[in-house]
Each structure stands twice: as structure tokens, then as C-alpha cells.
């Protein structure tokens, strides 16, 4: 269906749906391609802002504020397309298309035991990320739900290389409640890769986890949490590598490339050549016969 026959609302839905499906690192490319098709700058700008805000939350887009990394997620959304950073105590809007911070405002935070624990966990997690990720980023947020305090830790690393025709993202999220003796950690690890040289191949792998941690003091909890994340992510990485190796050796080879059959029969090349001559240079009365012979030969 041509886009010209769609109403404005239908166009908005189509544009939004296509933009939110853009793989990590390819949002701007998808937006530019759609601009060539839509040719409506005002419509594309509005949809790009909305979809870009969702894209940032979905893939934990990293920023740098005052030299400190900030990960955007739905946990630090304030509304009206604004995000909040606990480290810098700033709220802002982020334009993904222009890669710019806008409308920056300062905010105060309540300094209590949970805030101190957040900073301690952040230090322990940053040490782990620096040791295990080439260009990793992490952030620890706090949230209050029904008078209960939670800490949310996010980790992100990516490699976007459109020149080599592939993009990859690793992210994980860990949530636990601030309890005095025992707390349950809920985590999710997510990996996505997109290869688009010769073939268009998308790979998504994720795993949900639940573990318990004893709480003695804040320093012990922070170190135990960092060790838990390291242990679970190492296991996940080893399992993913094993599965991808098996996939490349067996499934992909069978799906994307079919081996030539071994027939162990003699081929009558002379007959094939004569049949091809009939097809390529048909004479009166031989056209129908030649088509059937060629079809049988191909099958």
C-alpha cells in the first residue's frame, strides 16, 4: 500500500512502529531512510522525538554528563520526555537525532541511608564493569514503590560499526529491595546483534534470574552484589558462546546453505546439451516438449 493513500494518523502509527523496531545503534539511519519516503519534516520530527525517547529507554542509551556516564532507562524517566541523573543531580531532555542534551535543570535529592548505599553499590559495580567490559557503562538508581526502597543497577556495552555491517549490544538490569537481613535480586541479561552483510540476520538472547543475598552491612552487600552479577554474567556469556557455536556449525549451515546431494549416478551431458539447444533454439513442434524436458532436468 502506498503511503500517500494513508491518513495522517495511519502514517503516524506506521512511522512510529517502524522507528521503535530499529535495532540498537541504527535509529538515526532508520529515521533518515523514512524521511526520504515520507517527505513531511514536521511529522517526522514529532514521531522521531517520541520514538527516540522510547528507543533510549529500551536500549539504555549512554550519555556523559560532567565526565560521568549516564544510562537512560524507564527507571529514571520524569515525564515530558525528561530524564533524571542521580550522580549529577540534573534533569534534562535528550535529542537522540541530534545527540544533544536540552533544557537541563538542577534537582535536589534526599540524602539518607538508601542514597549512601546506592553510592557504595555504584562504586563496586563500576570496578566490575571496568574489569570486564571494553567500553562498558553502569548506573545505579533508586526508586520508592509503596514506601519500599529499591535499587536498580543497569549495565550497558555496545559496538556499533555500520562500516563492517554489524551492530551489537549487551545490557543487564538488576533490582533488589533494601532490606535489613535478606534481599532478593531480580535480574535480566539481554544481548542483541544485527548482521547485514550478504544476509540480514538478527540475534536476540535474554535470561531472567532470581537470587538471594544476605545483608550484613552496606559494604558487604555492595561487594556481594557485584560478585553475584559477575558470576551470573560469566555463566550467561559462556552459554551464549556455546549456543552460537552450535548454531553456526549445525542450524545455520543447514538453513542458509544446502549441501550438494551425492547422487552417484552418471550424467548424460550429451542429452542435456541437446535438450538445452531445443529450449534455447526451439523449432516448430518442439517448444512444449523442450519445456517439459528442462523442468524434469532441473527437478
UniProtKB/Swiss-Prot annotation:
GO cellular component: cortical cytoskeleton; F-actin capping protein complex; membrane; sperm head
Compartments, as annotated in UniProt: Cytoplasm, Cytoskeleton
Gene Ontology MF term list: actin binding
UniProt keywords, alphabetically: Actin capping, Actin-binding, Cytoplasm, Cytoskeleton, Phosphoprotein
InterPro entries assigned to the protein according to its UniProt record, in alphabetical order: CapZ_alpha, CapZ_alpha/beta, CapZ_alpha/beta_2, CapZ_alpha_1, F-actin_cap_asu_CS
Presence of the UniProt keyword Transferase in the record: no
Any one biological process term the GO annotation gives: cytoplasm organization
Protein task: F-actin-capping proteins bind in a Ca(2+)-independent manner to the fast growing ends of actin filaments (barbed end) thereby blocking the exchange of subunits at these ends. Unlike other capping proteins (such as gelsolin and severin), these proteins do not sever actin filaments. May play a role in the morphogenesis of spermatid.
Database matches in PANTHER family: F-ACTIN-CAPPING PROTEIN SUBUNIT ALPHA, F-ACTIN-CAPPING PROTEIN SUBUNIT ALPHA-3
Protein name in the entry: F-actin-capping protein subunit alpha-3
Amino acid at each position: 500500500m502506498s503511503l500517500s493513500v494513508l491518513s495522517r494518523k495511519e502514517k503516524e502509527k506506521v512511522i512510529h512502529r517502524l522507528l521503535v523496531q530499529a535495532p540498537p545503534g541504527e535509529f538515526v539511519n532508520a529515521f533518515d531512510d523514512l524521511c526520504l519516503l515520507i517527505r513531511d519534516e514536521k511529522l517526522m520530527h514529532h514521531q522521531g522525538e517520541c520514538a527516540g525517547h522510547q528507543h533510549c529507554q529500551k536500549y539504555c542509551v549512554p550519555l556523559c554528563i560532567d565526565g560521568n556516564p549516564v544510562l537512560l532507562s524507564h527507571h529514571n524517566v520524569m515525564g515530558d520526555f525528561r530524564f533524571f541523573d542521580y550522580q549529577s543531580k540534573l534533569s534534562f531532555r535528550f535529542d537522540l537525532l541530534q545527540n544533544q542534551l536540552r533544557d537541563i535543570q538542577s534537582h535536589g535529592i534526599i540524602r539518607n541511608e538508601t542514597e549512601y548505599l546506592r553510592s557504595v553499590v555504584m562504586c563496586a559495580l563500576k570496578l566490575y564493569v571496568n574489569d570486564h567490559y571494553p567500553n562498558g557503562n553502569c548506573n545505579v538508581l533508586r526508586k520508592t514503590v509503596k514506601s519500599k526502597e529499591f535499587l536498580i543497577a543497569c549495565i550497558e556495552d555496545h559496538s556499533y560499526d555500520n562500516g563492517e555491517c554489524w551492530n551489537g549490544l549487551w545490557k543487564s538490569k538488576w533490582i533488589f529491595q533494601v532490606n535489613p537481613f535478606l534481599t532478593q535480586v531480580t535480574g535480566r541479561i539481554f544481548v542483541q546483534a544485527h548482521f547485514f552483510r550478504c544476509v540480514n540476520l538478527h540475534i536476540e538472547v535474554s535470561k531472567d534470574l532470581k537470587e538471594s543475598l544476605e545483608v550484613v552491612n552496606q559494604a558487604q552487600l555492595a561487594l556481594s552484589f557485584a560478585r553475584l552479577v559477575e558470576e551470573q554474567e560469566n555463566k550467561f556469556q559462556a552459554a551464549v558462546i556455546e549456543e552460537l557455536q552450535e548454531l553456526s556449525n549445525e542450524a545455520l549451515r543447514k538453513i542458509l546453505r544446502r549441501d550438494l546431494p551425492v547422487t552417484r549416478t552418471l550424467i548424460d551431458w550429451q542429452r542435456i546439451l541437446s535438450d538445452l539447444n531445443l529450449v534455447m533454439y526451439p523449432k516448430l513442434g518442439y517448444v512444449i516438449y523442450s519445456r517439459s524436458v528442462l523442468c524434469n532436468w532441473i527437478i
